[in-house]
Amino acid sequence: MTRIITCDEITRAVADLCREANYYLGKDVRGALEGALAREVSPQGKDVLNQLLENAAIAAAEEVPICQDTGVAVVFLELGQEVQVQGGYLYDAINAGVRQGYTEGYLRKSMVYPPLDGRNTGDNTPAIIHTEIVPGDKLTITVAPKGGGSENMSAAVMLAPAAGIRGVKEFVLETVKKAGPNPCPPLIVGVGIGGNFEKCALLAKKALLRPLGEPHPLEGIAALERDLLESINCLGIGPGGFGGRITALAVHVEIFARHIASLPVAVNIQCHAARHKSITL
Amino acid sequence: MKFKYPSRGTAPMDSNPACRRGAPATEDKRIRTPLEDAVVEDLRSGDRVLVSGVIYAARDSAHKRLVELLDRGEELPVDLKGQIIYYVGPAPARPGRVIGSAGPTTSGRMDPYTPRLIAATGLKGMIGKGYRSSEVKKALVDHKAVYFAAVGGAGALIARCIKRAEVIAYPDLGPEALHLLEVEDLPVTVINDCYGGDLYTEALARYSIKEVPELPLGKDPALS
């Protein structure tokens, strides 16, 4: 049985998601910021956390973006194998939604092409689209705008398997430490372990989509997440980099099988403006 | 998990006149552009400051063009003497609004241009976020200038402090155009002062915990 979803529906949905993701900070992030405010000991750190909470309230009330860097439109698709897309090409429909959402929603356009010495494309397209074919007859679309400041502080490495969990931990800590105040802490740190060169980066990015406060289902990985968070919060960078206990709100790790010769690790740094909104059609 | 919090007040002191570097924010200082040397001399890393007056918004591409003009010995589209540049690429304004969200962008990308601009124009301040290079920090000391950070990600809040915004050059750059902004009580924090004070370094000295708890490196089913 095939189910038909039209390109128009998809475009409308993507446009709405672009606006919503940029205007409304998720409840999980707001909750985490409030929790951080209670635990932060640094007065300057508290001041930053208060400003971020106030900022989220203003953005929602005025329907303006939480952050002026409304990012690259990263779009995740979970496309049911029984879905048939009609009325055009799926990726054109997604890009039309991004164009509409960013233009009509007064969001900043940040895409430049060609990458060396290029010009602003003017409508924030092209989106970066990741498609996964899944069982069923539904299409789930997640729009996750990703800012440049935090993305620039991200990193990947191909460790030797002998480096083990200690090597993973050292790389994550080194990446966060090196980033310092640049990616607008408090952070959400997405870590991908395993797979290969490109897979670990995608795992790290997907780790950022998990709601804050939800640990990895495997206890060993959940423990690694807790340990990494504690170590990161010992660095002292603090909110805004002004010093304090809260450098990260959460660490999310995602894993995949790896080659016997490699232990790939990627760290995708996310600022507090952790934006992602989903819809299932 | 057990670990020790260091006692407060561990920030290093030295003979530097910036003796309260890294101290918790107390009372806000108010400044108005253009800045005289005396105003800059009164600012210390860690101070919370409210900025009012005209400031200029410029980022990557606008900086490149400004420095190219200096290289060719041509006049800049704006006199930067005593002025502040804000590293921002604002979101578009909704109808009836002055500007869209307008938080700081990462300052380090402007490092290659900043010392030149300070020396050639008399620029006195920059607002952004994140680390500066040692060359920039030296230029701040040599020319009595100051680097502030605004709160990254607080773009909607900061937009409320902006009362007027005009594109004054490079409209082809879109969000990267050179803007004139009139601001009122824009909240910023002094990161690098004209005495070599550096809040980011002082903050780490004050708040980092050296005894990072040891990981329980137990068996990890997914990694072994």
Stretches found by the model and what they are:
Chain B
Residues 114-115, 191-224:
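Active-site/ligand-binding-proximal alpha/beta "capping" segment
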Residues 48, 54-58, 194:
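Short, charged beta-turn/beta-strand-edge "cap" motif at the junction between a beta-strand
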Residues 9-12, 22-24:
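N-terminal amphipathic/hydrophobic targeting modules at extreme N-termini
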Residues 57-186, 223-224:
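Feature captures the catalytic cores and cofactor-binding loops of soluble hydro-lyases/lyases
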Residues 26-35:
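Short, structured beta-strand/loop micro-motifs enriched in basic residues and often containing a Trp
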Residues 43-44, 49:
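Short, well-ordered loop/turn sites that connect or cap secondary structure elements
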Residues 37-42:
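Short, surface-exposed secondary-structure edge patches
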